Amino acid sequence: MKNVNLISSSSQKKGRIYYQITKKYRKTKINLSFCKGFRYLFPKKNYFYFIKNYDKMKLTRIFVPIVASLVLYSCASNNLSYEGKAFKSAYESIKADELKKNLMVIASDEMEGRETGSEGQKKAGVYMIDYYKNLGVSYPKALGSYYQKVPKEALKSRRGELPDSENILAFIEGTEKPEEIIVISAHYDHVGTNNGVVYNGADDDGSGTVAVMEIAEAFQQAKKAGKGPKRSILFLHVTGEEHGLLGSKYYSENPVFDLKNTVANLNIDMIGRSDKENEGKNYVYVIGSDMLSTELKKINVAANKATQNLELNYKYDDPN
C-alpha cells in the first residue's frame, strides 16, 4: 500500500475538514471524513430533543464501519475476513448507552459550549483524559502528556483574540508496524454561549468526540485480547475548529509523529443526526476516500458491507 502523508490543513466547506496531503511529489486536497448532517449551532432546546431521540438515531451503527475499516486497513487485502471476525467482539462493545453517557457530559451546560480556550472546554478535556486513563490508554511518549498546547499566537481568529488552548492526544502502539500511524480525529470545541444561552454542541462535534473515545475503548479491548492494531493509532481531539481548523493546522505544522509515517486520517464530524433529505435512513457521508487512495475506499466499502451495511453517501465527495 502506498504511503499518504498529512502535511497541513487548508480550508473548510459545509462542515468538512480538508487536509493537504502529498503522495510522493504530487499534492492534492483531501480528507476522509464521516459526517451526518451539517447544522452547526445546537442550543439547549435542540440539545434536549437530541438526547430524547438519541436511541432512535442508532448512533452506534454509524461508528462500527469506521472501527472495522481501521482494523482492515492494517491488514493485507486477502486477510480482510479473518481480521474482521477477530475484532467483532471489540467493536460490538460500542454501545449506545455508553455513547449517550459520555455525550451527556461533553455537551452539558457545565462545559459552557466548549468555546476554544474557555474553562468549559478545559473541563471537557479533563473528562476525556480521565476516560483514557481509566481505559489504560496512554499518550504519545514523545509528547509527555495528553496535552499538545496550542498557544494563542496560533489561534488568531476573525472573531477576536483567543486564549491558549490544547489538542488532546491518546495513543495505542501497533504490534507489527508501530512506526506507522493512523489518526482518528474529531474536534471537541464548539461556539460557547451567546446572550446567556449555552450552545451545547451535542452534534457539532460532541458526537464525533464521543465516537473517537468509544473507538479507542474498542481498540484497547482488542489489544487486551491479543488482537491489537498492527499500525499505531493516534486518537486526536483538536481545538479551534470553529475558528478555522486552527487546532488541525497546528498539529499539521507541529506533528508529534513524523508526517511521512502518517498513513491515513479518519475524521469524524457531526454524526449525531440526519438531515431532512435523509430522514429515517441509516447513512453516513463519506468524503475523500477515493481521492486519498483507491485501496482505502475499497476497504471502507468492504468493512461496511461486512458489519452494518450503512448507506455510504458520496454527495459531498468532491475535491473543491
Model-derived regions, located:
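Cationic, amphipathic, low-complexity segments that mediate targeting or membrane/lipid association
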Residues: M1-I51
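N-terminal capping segment at the start of a domain
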Residues: Y82-K88, E92-K123, L135, Y139-K141, ...
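C-terminal motif of bacterial Sec signal peptides marking the signal peptidase cleavage site
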Residues: Y73-S74
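Structural recognition of the beta-strand scaffold that forms the well-ordered cores
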Residues: M104-A107, L169, I181-S185, L234-H237, ...
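A non-catalytic alpha/beta surface segment that caps or lines the substrate-entry region
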Residues: R114-I172
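Metal-dependent peptidase/peptidase-like ectodomains
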Residues: V238-N320
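Alpha-helical metal-binding/catalytic segments enriched in His/Glu/Asp
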Residues: I168, I184-H243
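Second-shell loop/turn segments in exported
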Residues: G84-S93, D109-E119, L155-R158, G196-D205, ...
